[in-house]
Amino acid sequence: MHILQACKGMEHRSISSLIVNQKRQFLLTATATLVGSMIMNENNRLANKMEKGQLHYKDANAIFNKALEAQESKYFSRSKSNYPGHVPLFTFEKLLMIAGSSLGAYLHPERNEFIVALGESTAITPVLTKLQTQMLSDPVGRQILRERPRITSTSLDLDKLRELPDNTIGKTYVNWLDREGVSPDTRVPVKYIDDEELAYIYQRYRECHDFYHSITGLPIIIEGEIAVKILEFMNIGIPMSGLGALFAPLRLKPSQKERLYNIYYPWGFKSGLNSKPLINVYWENILEEDINEFRHKMGIEQPPDLRNLRKKYFEELKKKKKV
């Protein structure tokens, strides 16, 4: 009897302990869930504030950083872009670009990146402003600045130009492109000239370069490029053209220098000074005009065929070697 009562007492205590343990486990679980929920809610609240920019933590280095930024902006504050693709440069960067691109263009005139950088870095504001005034004082120049056409293979429709008569400006132009194996799409956009309209004027000059080749018949070999640079410099006044005409011949052979100095330099000076401003020619609107009438109207003489002169020179050289 006593044993039975003892067993019942032990069973009652076990059940009580089990109930207490279950209650304790439930309370712990509920407490953990409540605390976790509070933490998650606080994290979500902070995240929302952070996303909305409503959090303002005090930075111990804020005063120092602000002073440092002010000092840096005083000397190295790069201005904002004035047009798509514009890359503002500090004065010292422009000077470094002039030095580096000048050396690169002299040693490797075939590399376009040096020519492009030298052209833009030396296209100083007074020169471009003078061209701007020249365009604004001419009805066609004003139309170009107002409409801002771009010269590409699409805008010109080269296939249509190939169907024009042989004596037209358009057919002469596309024949020159085909013969030299070049395309108007290779002209890179201007990005280092700060003023937006002056940048377009330089872009226009750059894209018209092949027209100067085509109306004169000069090829893209080094002698032909120098001859066109002389014409450009005397007529338009772009500094890089003058630099190219001055220094590029230094690396040429005596026979090449002789042709330039005796034939193409005098031609470039005369045609460049006597002809009307080439920057004011709206090429896209005169593609069907007669090329000879255009040369006469502009005052541009067609120089001797450079390729024929070179061909004759090498033929004579071969004859002398045989003798």
Curated annotation (Swiss-Prot):
Function: Lyase that catalyzes the C1-decarboxylation of 4-hydroxy-3-methoxy-5-(all-trans-polyprenyl)benzoic acid into 2-methoxy-6-(all-trans-polyprenyl)phenol during ubiquinone biosynthesis.
HAMAP family from the UniProt entry: Coq4
Membrane topology (UniProt): Peripheral membrane protein
Keywords noted in UniProt: Lyase, Membrane, Metal-binding, Mitochondrion, Mitochondrion inner membrane, Ubiquinone biosynthesis, Zinc
The UniProt record lists the keyword Zinc: yes
Catalytic reaction annotation: a 4-hydroxy-3-methoxy-5-(all-trans-polyprenyl)benzoate + H(+) = a 2-methoxy-6-(all-trans-polyprenyl)phenol + CO2
Localization: Mitochondrion inner membrane
Family affiliation: Belongs to the COQ4 family.
Gene name in the database record: COQ4
Protein residues bound to Zn(2+): H209, D210, H213, E225
Cellular component GO terms, alphabetical: extrinsic component of mitochondrial inner membrane
Taxonomic superkingdom: Eukaryota
SUBUNIT field: Component of a multi-subunit COQ enzyme complex, composed of at least COQ3, COQ4, COQ5, COQ6, COQ7 and COQ9.
Additional notes on this entry: This protein may be expected to contain an N-terminal transit peptide but none has been predicted.
Metabolic or biological pathway, per its Swiss-Prot or TrEMBL entry: Cofactor biosynthesis; ubiquinone biosynthesis
Name the UniProt record assigns to this protein: Ubiquinone biosynthesis protein COQ4, mitochondrial
Pfam families per record: Coq4 (PF05019)
Assigned EC number: 4.1.1.130
